[in-house]
Amino acid sequence: VQRLYPFQLSGGMARRVLFSTAVITDASLIIADEPTPGMDVKSAVEALQLLRELADAGKGVLLITHDIDLAVEVADTVAVFYEGRTVDMAPAAAFHGDGAELVHPYTKALYHALPQNDFTVYTAAEVTQMTAAGGA
């Protein structure tokens, strides 16, 4: 790996190299943008456990993902973006239970789309209508 250019690495290998770099440096903030695609399941689980350990050790970890289940399982706090803006910020635990702490209609739609919450799927028009009514 040491003699290879980044474009010569597979997606999973490149992510493993980046995780290794994060561990051996003294960075106070680690930004992980979609860290698990391209990794096999075992490597992805290990990478997420590593991020959790780094956060527990006092490092700042910003996990950027489209996988709401992953965010809820790994993060302490989940920020939800809609149309390029942060519309909600809640403890990850708020996505379990009844979702009463969730404020924005888009966040509530995401909550209801989770399999453990009856997997209610809304059309784009319904989400747009809900956010317009709820004040985006």
Predicted regions and their residues:
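Conserved signature/switch motifs of ABC ATPase nucleotide-binding domains
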Residues: 25, 57
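A short, surface-exposed alpha-helical micro-motif characterized by mixed small hydrophobic
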Residues: 71-73
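Conserved ABC ATPase signature
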Residues: 5-9
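Catalytic Walker B motif of ABC-type/P-loop ATPase nucleotide-binding domains
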Residues: 30-33
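C-terminal boundary and immediately downstream tail of ABC-type ATPase nucleotide-binding domains
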Residues: 98-135
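H-loop/switch region of ABC-family ATPase nucleotide-binding domains
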Residues: 65-66
